[in-house]
Amino acid sequence: MTGGGKSGGKASSGKNAQSRSSKAGLAFPVGRVHRLLRKGNYAQRVGAGAPVYLAAVLEYLAAEILELAGNAARDNKKTRIIPRHLQLAIRNDEELNKLLGHVTIAQGGVLPNIHQNLLPKKTGTKPGKNASQEL
């Protein structure tokens, strides 16, 4: 009787399988990003750190956009994020607007903007200095 362990004849190191996403502390799938980088013919070879870095960047961008869109939804007294909230979040943020400047968001609408020349002119007379109040 050789190898009298409880492993059932299978040599195991005692560690459970851990995904690369959980090792990196990410929610985005590192394995899927790696597969897409390989299948996309971007390069002949893909390093081990490249999909981790790319997944982290994508997760950060998604979190940033969703944070701003959630704030826009809350400002409009809504509990559900709609494309209009995404549009407002992206267009009101300078860096995201620069990154996604040529992106069209379906059902996003436009930013409310009225040109200064079209606004009614304010009269500059102050009360107490009218000519009708002479003695």
UniProtKB/Swiss-Prot annotation:
Per UniProt, subcellular location reads as: Nucleus; Chromosome
Instruction: Write down which residues bear the modification named N6-acetyllysine.
Output: K6, K10
- Gene3D superfamilies per record: Histone, subunit A
Q: Which domain of life is it from?
A: Eukaryota
Motif [ST]-Q motif in this chain: 132-133
The PTM N5-methylglutamine maps to Q107
Keyword set includes DNA repair: yes
Q: Which PANTHER family match?
A: HISTONE H2A
Miscellaneous field: In contrast to vertebrates and insects, its C-terminus is not monoubiquitinated.
Task: Family membership, please give it.
Answer: Belongs to the histone H2A family.
Tell me the subunit arrangement: The nucleosome is a histone octamer containing two molecules each of H2A, H2B, H3 and H4 assembled in one H3-H4 heterotetramer and two H2A-H2B heterodimers. The octamer wraps approximately 147 bp of DNA.
Q: What is this protein called?
A: Histone H2A
User: What is the organism field in this record?
Assistant: Podospora anserina
